Design a protein with these regions (language model features):
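Acidic, glycine/polar-enriched metal-coordinating patches/loops
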Residues: 1-68
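Kelch-like beta-propeller repeat domains
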Residues: 36-40, 48, 63-359
């Protein structure tokens, strides 16, 4: 009868795969007779129909795909490996308040010049690096911040590479660029189970000593580095893990910098070296656009690392400067991308470490 209502909702979010067909059982649907095929096929869709008489039949009064709730960033971080004067595998956890903890005994092969990123939504991975020669081993990080033993490498052994998280669920990662006997541009995807895939042919200018971070909630960006000189070019990573061609550089060309996400959907490149130590930063918008230089805060340094913490904040830590070859200080990044002054270091002073977030 007139005014009758029916509601359909895709609670399982599978209509994009299976869809539904509504049979109006001899009645019209939006003025069309029963021979008209009515199909809906969008994940998360909700349809609310009402009967409005023989002429119009059933008519939809609501047809809307409900968006997934935003996936929050990880709460804690971890800095690991590096060079303390000799190669090390120690790690330092970062709390959800940005407090760096004391050293955790090494697990896995000591090395430097490696990279780290997130996978699985709440876990991390350290990979590749320099053990005295180029390496392709990886070490998974649990959602409790526990580093696992070595996993036999996949992909070209290299050092001076970078890595970041990507995908709509924030559950995959990518390692890219680096150095073997020269600068390279290949990449290796990391599945949501932490499995590293074989080399993908490089896109963009081959380079080493670059940095990478997430932006837009589901994408990544590699930037800066060194070819035959310092560069500021960037390469965006889609939410399918596809690296785009070079984007003309913005900001001071430099190498040995670090990057992390902040504000849940933005990123920041910071510090580095271009003939002298730098403390400048460059913010990355949620569209992957890199901003011009922001004046440096904190001790100018290079060969440091960075990660997010607290869901929407970041931290730069460790590294080296002109007067102190090994540092342990850190600088917090607010959810507005503002870098704070130096925090007294905790843990073994070192350079050329890596970092990622978890939990």
């Amino acid at each position: 009868s007139n005014g009758d209502e029916i509601m359909f909702a895709d609670y399982d979010r599978t209509w994009g795969t299976y869809g539904i067909t509504i049979d109006s059982n001899g009645l019209n649907y939006q003025g069309d007779d029963d021979s008209y095929i009515v199909e809906y096929g969008t994940d998360g869709q909700a349809v609310h129909i009402v009967y409005s008489g023989a002429t119009n039949g059933w008519i939809p009064i609501l047809d809307k795909a409900v968006a997934d709730a935003p996936i929050p960033g990880n709460q804690e971080g971890i800095f690991g490996f590096g060079n303390t004067g000799s190669l090390t595998g120690v790690t330092n956890l970062v709390s959800n308040a940005g407090v760096v903890a004391t050293d955790v005994a090494a697990v896995g092969t000591a090395r430097s010049r490696l990279a780290g990123c997130e996978y699985g939504g709440d876990k991390g991975i350290f990979g590749f690096g320099d053990t005295g020669s180029a390496s392709d081993i990886t070490n998974l990080v649990s959602n409790a911040g526990v580093v696992a033993s070595d996993i036999t490498g996949v992909g070209t052994a290299r050092l001076y590479l970078a890595a970041c998280n990507y995908s709509s669920n924030r559950d995959k990662g990518i390692f890219a660029y680096g150095y073997t006997s020269g600068a390279v541009s290949m990449s290796n995807l990391v599945s949501n189970a932490g499995v590293v895939a074989a080399d993908v042919t490089g896109v963009g200018t081959a380079r080493e000593r670059s940095a990478a971070c997430e932006y837009g909630g589901d994408k990544g960006i590699f930037g800066y580095g060194y070819t035959s000189g310092n560069v500021s070019i960037t390469n965006l990573v889609s939410n399918a893990g596809v690296i785009a061609t070079d984007t003309t550089g913005v900001g001071t060309a430099r190498r040995f910098l670090a990057a992390c996400s902040y504000g849940e959907d933005k990123g920041i490149f910071g510090f580095g070296y271009n003939g002298g130590m730098q403390a400048i930063t460059n913010l990355v918008s949620n569209a992957g656009v890199v901003a011009t230089d922001t004046a440096g805060v904190g001790t100018a340094r290079y060969v440091l690392s960075a990660t997010q913490y607290g869901g929407d904040k970041g931290i730069f830590a460790y590294g080296s400067d002109d007067s102190t070859p090994l540092l342990s200080l850190s600088n917090l990044v607010s959810n507005a991308g503002v870098v704070a002054s130096d925090v007294t270091g905790v843990g073994s002073a070192r350079e050329q470490s890596a970092a990622c977030s978890f939990n």
